[in-house]
Amino acid sequence: MHPTRTKLLAAAALLAALAAPAGAADVTLLNVSYDPTRELYEQVNSAFAAQWKASRGQGLTVKQSHGGSGKQARAVLDGLEADVVTLALAYDVDAVAKGGLVKPDWQKRLPDNASPYTSTIVFLVRKGNPKGIKDWNDLVRPGVQVITPNPKTSGGARWNYLAAWAYAHQAFKGDEAKVKGFIKALFANVPVLDSGARGSTTTFVERGIGDVLLAWENEAFLAVDRLGKGELEIVVPKLSILAEPPVAVVDSVVDRRGTRAVAEAYLEFLYTEQGQEIAARNHYRPRNAKVAARYASAFPKVQLVTVDGAFGGWQQAQKTHFADGGLFDQLYTPGR
């Protein structure tokens, strides 16, 4: 992200904070997010609420809702009153926009297509890596159990699937029959499809099911730091995908509730140096160059494809792979 844009956002957030009368009544926001962002937004909410209180004299409570990204988008469309959505992929925010709740230009309102941090997909294995898993090709071996959520409900699962497809496309030099065979074999090794990424982490870590978990990079680090107790290891594949989780104000809700100023400032805070520092501490890759340099050693180098470059964008990827009757439905056989 360009440093001048960062300074402008910080100034805009401060001006928004100073614009309202001091001592205004306390305000509440609802952030509807995807599955593994709980810890990130607990820290963001605390820091932003303190800043908002100091600058405006107004108390702020940010409530959180978490689940599979697709399910969360549908919940907002069905009436869950989110002031902001912080979802796993642009397609899910576009779905909310198509429902008339978010304006179509939402990606142009904030830098980096309204994606303040990035992540990627890595493997989480058990201590000592007993199955010797090093790259995607190891996931289709007989006897290897792979844990991943359901791409029909989970944004992380869609990133997992597309990363696997991108690997196979490169490995098989674009031979679509072989790519499909690879994906079919991979999902034949999946014993259970949870609805969201955190559910899959629970299945792998707490229930002890599976040999390898396909995980958001931040979720894998969190599992090792706080859940694994020295019993888990991260394996970084040679190729993965650049995951760009987006954020947006839900226009219809903030205009009805009168929370637009605080909701916009909340999302702008994610781009400030403080917000980027919080993201990096929670193992999300920051956009801010200065913060990224400080945390460079924390993030492994990996070849990353993009959804736009490899799949023609999220609209095309969704239609081809994840829509009813799409390639995922064709290649996945439940209960195998």
Regions found by a protein language model. Name each.
Residues 25-154, 332-336:
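N-terminal segment of the mature folded domain
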Residues 32-34, 125-127, 145-172, 187-190, ...:
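Short beta-strand->loop
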